[in-house]
Amino acid sequence: MEAKKDKAQQVADVSHLLSTSAGFVIFDYTSMSAIEATSIRKKLFKNGSKIKVIKNNILRRALKAGKFEGIDETAIKGKLAVAVGVNEIVETLKAVDGVVKAKEAMNFVCGYFDNRAFNSADLEKIAKLPGRNELYGMFLSVLQAPLRKFLYALEAVKAAK
């Protein structure tokens, strides 16, 4: 009886962790070494994110309890870890993607953020997108280019006189 209460508490804790986060990514960590696990934990910690290894049955129940619609529960099998993004889920996804790319046996299973479920193919595409700071840089360079051209034109007119 005590074991059931303990499992129910674990389900509640995991459900609370997932529902209060910005999003999460579930991935297969089958061939990840201890060094790679430490590396990914450090990268995620810098982003304010965390990684948890949760039993599949508890994870399935937590997903049901949290009402995360669209997640394929049949995909929750094998050795899985959950990367939970507290602030910025895209940075969390990129950190996990760096390790997943290095190992062929590892792959994304599914993810959930912005009130939407994503499959592994979607997560791989999103991980290839530039991050927030890179997008800001691109945007500013686009804004700066016309001003720079205008200044060069003014200098050319000034030099012509």
From Swiss-Prot:
Highest rank taxon of the organism: Bacteria
Record bears the keyword RNA-binding: yes
GO BP annotation list: translation
Record-level GO cellular component terms: large ribosomal subunit
Keyword hit for Ribosomal protein: yes
InterPro entries from the UniProt entry: Ribosomal_uL10, Ribosomal_uL10-like_sf, Ribosomal_uL10_bac, Ribosomal_uL10_bac_type, Ribosomal_uL10_CS_bac
Example GO molecular function: structural constituent of ribosome
Membrane spanning stretches: none
UniProt KW keywords: Ribonucleoprotein, Ribosomal protein, RNA-binding, rRNA-binding
Family per record: Belongs to the universal ribosomal protein uL10 family.
HAMAP family, A to Z: Ribosomal_uL10
NCBIfam families recorded: PRK00099.1-1 (NF000955)
Function noted in UniProt: Forms part of the ribosomal stalk, playing a central role in the interaction of the ribosome with GTP-bound translation factors.
Self-association and partners: Part of the ribosomal stalk of the 50S ribosomal subunit. The N-terminus interacts with L11 and the large rRNA to form the base of the stalk. The C-terminus forms an elongated spine to which L12 dimers bind in a sequential fashion forming a multimeric L10(L12)X complex.
Record protein name field: Large ribosomal subunit protein uL10
Organism: Mycoplasma pneumoniae (strain ATCC 29342 / M129 / Subtype 1) (Mycoplasmoides pneumoniae)
Encoding gene, per UniProt annotation: rplJ
